[in-house]
């Protein structure tokens, strides 16, 4: 875009051997009536417009900051027409909602405290390269437009996604990776922060291991995202954040409006705080030593009524100030006790975990279920399996068009003993479900290993701290109960942070397994999930302007000890996948030639519908010729497979049949033998001893070689149609031919 009124700045992101990215900030051409507006480009082919506006008057009756962040995904940005019935954009996609949360979390603490004017930030995706991820660009765009708006905002805030990508030269943290690059990444992390002196203070982290991380680590030797590696990633993000902040500050210095004086509504005046502190501090110290949540809440409410009643006459008409001051005094009392005495609300030490319980198979008929409890937090996980055609279809700007694993999180009001609205999920529930999903995706079996769509539902039945991490634990339990062959168990823990002035110095204390009150009165909610070997997901939110990376690194190590303890409890409840439920569909796979797909489907679907009607099985066909057959019982699935093979694979090998095959490939675990064109079987190394006079075989090539003819018998056909073979030796053939005369002789003797 060109024009004399346009002003711009650029941030150059240098990824070394992975190339450079250019983030360009522009203002002055579009959305001129907004308080602040900015166009942000990444490499000139992805463009976002961010506009920030503020209400002219404070919202009456509000005791919080009314900030709204919205993302508008325009399908024309990717050259597409929306797939909805009306062919226009409707409600925001899950990706857009998660992007809104990603922007809101670092921006909200940066506004001046006490602001009550409504502020709205709208980011519109105007053009996008299908290989780009726009969410992190949106963080920078929203910060830029807010910087320009004249609002009391302590920006700029920079956001960057860094991914640990491996190539021939090793692993490197790469900023602003593309979708295609993430296929070779083991971990990707969104980090937002601001410049604090000579350093960068971190304000938000959202991170996860990738879908391919397990294979990259276990099979290709890529670096595992341990706590130390993740800490290195936080440090690697800092120079990029600094470059982004400097580019924003440069443009803001030339184009920002003067900061407007907005009315600021302090929660209370100093005289109110002093009176409440004198009346309540000592009693609050006793109240917040009560371990039980409901008893503690009741005692706190009674004390609050008592204090407010005693001071109402002295501060007539200032009841809201009294209430806010009571909360602030409570916060100070709790924090000082933690920092000075190293003792928490319920009497635990800083690293102690509440009592844990884990139980599986808690519901009848469902495919998998479990309950996980951590103190008063209680989560029920329920797993449902179905055909792959039931996976979620996605119509968004992302190149991902389908999702096999779907994680839904529900947080009913009764989980905290309150009343409230139930129904469609709110942004918080969508965000918590997405976090639990990201924690578990790296350990899921592949589509080929487990050809099922998986829906996982987490029901928060009781809440007192970290229901999202409880959902991760409950989901691990219920999926194992459902028979999902997870590559490893995953557990999660929520860490907290308390900081305050003690003896004139700022002290930090990291808390393991935080309560709801510690979350409310603390400075940080830091959730970490992972296996016993590495981290699979992280989410960090802070109420401060930023947290030193060294403090976060220490909290990560502290979280690992807690995670290992929780994994022991999970493994004690269930350590291997159970058998599939009798109520779950049995899914088997058959491979047919691509040119036979039309014959199996038949004219207008006549043939496939007839097979489904006759057998009661559910059939879906992939473009590559893979046919998935699902049925509630084995005979139905086998009947459908036979019917399909009769059409597409009329000469399908059966168990017990013998072939003179040709060795086509040798591996460390056996040899692959071609039986017929396009049909191979595995002759496992343990079977080769029959060809070596019963001796143990350590090297396959010592017994057979490529091109050698071998007489084999089919011993097994698995659900995916793969054949297991056994060699047929001369003695076996001779014994088979001698059996008949021997039996005849025995009969005549009798």
Swiss-Prot record:
Subcellular location: Cytoplasm
Listed CDD domains: KH-I_PNPase (cd02393), RNase_PH_PNPase_2 (cd11364)
InterPro entries associated with the record: ExoRNase_PH_dom1 (IPR001247), ExoRNase_PH_dom2_sf (IPR036345), GPSI/PNP (IPR014069), KH_dom (IPR004087), KH_dom_type_1 (IPR004088), KH_dom_type_1_sf (IPR036612), NA-bd_OB-fold (IPR012340), PNPase (IPR012162)
A Gene Ontology cellular-component term: cytosol
Signal peptide span: none
Renumbered residue ranges of the record's region Disordered: 725-750
Domain S1 motif positions: 656-728
Key word DNA repair present: no
GO molecular function, one term: magnesium ion binding
Reactions this protein catalyses: RNA(n+1) + phosphate = RNA(n) + a ribonucleoside 5'-diphosphate
KH domain: residues covered: 585-644
Compositionally skewed regions (Acidic residues) per UniProt: 730-750
EC number: 2.7.7.8
Binding site for Mg(2+): 519, 525
PANTHER family: POLYRIBONUCLEOTIDE NUCLEOTIDYLTRANSFERASE, POLYRIBONUCLEOTIDE NUCLEOTIDYLTRANSFERASE 1, MITOCHONDRIAL
Function: Involved in mRNA degradation. Catalyzes the phosphorolysis of single-stranded polyribonucleotides processively in the 3'- to 5'-direction.
Protein's UniProt name: Polyribonucleotide nucleotidyltransferase
Species this protein is from: Paenarthrobacter aurescens (strain TC1)
UniProt lineage: Bacteria, Bacillati, Actinomycetota, Actinomycetes, Micrococcales
């Amino acid at each position: 875009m060109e024009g004399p009124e346009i002003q711009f700045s650029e941030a150059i992101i240098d990824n070394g051997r992975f190339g450079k990215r250019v983030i360009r900030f522009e203002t002055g051409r579009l959305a001129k009536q907004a308080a602040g507006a900015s166009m942000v480009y990444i490499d000139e082919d992805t463009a976002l417009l961010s506009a920030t506006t503020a209400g002219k008057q404070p919202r009456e009756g509000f005791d919080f900051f009314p900030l709204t962040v919205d993302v508008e995904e325009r399908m024309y940005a990717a050259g597409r027409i929306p797939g909805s019935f009306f062919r226009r954009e409707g409600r925001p996609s899950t990706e857009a909602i998660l992007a809104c949360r990603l922007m809101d979390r670092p921006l909200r603490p940066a506004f001046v405290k006490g602001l009550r004017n409504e502020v709205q930030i709208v980011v519109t995706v105007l053009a996008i390269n299908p290989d780009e991820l726009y969410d992190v660009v949106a963080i920078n765009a929203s910060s830029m437009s807010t910087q320009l708006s004249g609002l009391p905002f302590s920006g700029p805030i920079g956001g960057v996604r860094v991914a640990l990508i491996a190539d021939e030269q090793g692993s490197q943290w790469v900023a602003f990776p593309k979708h295609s690059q993430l296929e070779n990444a083991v971990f990707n992390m969104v980090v937002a922060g601001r410049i604090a002196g000579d350093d960068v203070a971190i304000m938000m982290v959202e991170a996860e291991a990738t879908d391919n991380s397990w294979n990259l680590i276990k099979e290709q030797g890529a670096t595992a995202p341990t706590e130390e590696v993740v800490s290195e990633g936080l440090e690697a993000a800092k120079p990029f954040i600094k470059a982004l902040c400097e580019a924003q500050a440069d443009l803001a210095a030339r184009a920002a409006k003067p900061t407007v004086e907005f009315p600021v509504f302090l929660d209370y005046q100093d005289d109110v705080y002093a009176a409440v502190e004198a009346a309540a501090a000592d009693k609050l110290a006793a109240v917040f030593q009560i371990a039980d949540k409901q008893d503690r809440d009741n005692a706190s409410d009674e004390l609050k009524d008592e204090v407010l009643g005693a001071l109402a006459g002295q501060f007539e008409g200032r009841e809201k100030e009294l209430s806010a001051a009571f909360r602030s005094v409570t916060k100070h009392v709790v924090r000082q006790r933690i920092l000075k005495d190293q003792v928490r609300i319920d009497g635990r030490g800083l690293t102690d975990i509440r009592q844990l319980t884990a139980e599986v198979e808690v519901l009848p008929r469902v495919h998998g279920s479990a309950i996980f409890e951590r103190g008063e937090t209680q989560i029920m996980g329920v797993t449902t399996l179905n055909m792959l055609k039931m996976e979620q279809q996605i119509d968004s700007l992302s190149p991902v068009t389908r999702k096999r694993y779907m994680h839904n999180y529900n947080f009913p009001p009764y989980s905290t003993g309150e009343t409230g609205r139930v129904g469609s999920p709110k942004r918080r529930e969508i965000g918590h479900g997405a976090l639990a999903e990201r924690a578990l995706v790296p350990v899921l079996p592949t589509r080929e290993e487990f050809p099922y769509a998986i829906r996982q539902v987490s029901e928060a039945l009781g809440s007192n701290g970290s229901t999202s991490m409880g959902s991760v634990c409950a989901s691990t339990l219920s999926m194992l109960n459902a028979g999902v062959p997870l590559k490893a168990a995953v557990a999660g823990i929520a860490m907290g942070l308390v900081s305050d002035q003690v003896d004139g110095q700022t002290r930090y204390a990291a808390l393991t397994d935080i309560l709801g009150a510690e979350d409310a009165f603390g400075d940080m909610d830091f959730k970490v999930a992972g296996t016993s070997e590495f981290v699979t997901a992280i989410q960090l939110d802070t109420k401060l302007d930023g947290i030193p990376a060294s403090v976060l690194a220490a909290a990560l190590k502290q979280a690992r000890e807690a995670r290992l303890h929780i994994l022991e409890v999970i493994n004690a409840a269930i350590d291997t996948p159970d058998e599939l439920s009798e109520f779950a569909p049995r899914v088997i796979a058959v491979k047919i030639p691509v040119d036979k797909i039309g014959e199996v489907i038949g004219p207008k679907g006549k043939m496939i519908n007839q097979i489904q009607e006759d057998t009661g099985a559910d059939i879906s066909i992939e473009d590559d010729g893979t046919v998935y057959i699902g049925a509630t019982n084995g005979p139905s699935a086998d009947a459908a497979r036979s019917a399909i093979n009769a059409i597409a694979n009329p000469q399908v090998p059966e168990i017990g049949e013998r072939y003179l095959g040709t060795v086509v490939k040798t591996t460390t675990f056996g040899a692959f033998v071609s039986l017929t064109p396009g049909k191979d079987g595995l002759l496992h190394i343990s079977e080769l001893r029959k060809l070596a006079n019963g001796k143990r075989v350590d090297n396959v090539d010592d017994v057979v070689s490529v091109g050698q003819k071998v007489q084999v018998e089919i011993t097994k056909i698995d659900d995916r149609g793969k054949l297991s073979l056994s060699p047929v030796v001369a003695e076996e053939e001779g014994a088979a031919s001698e059996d008949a005369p021997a039996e005849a002789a025995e009969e005549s003797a009798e």
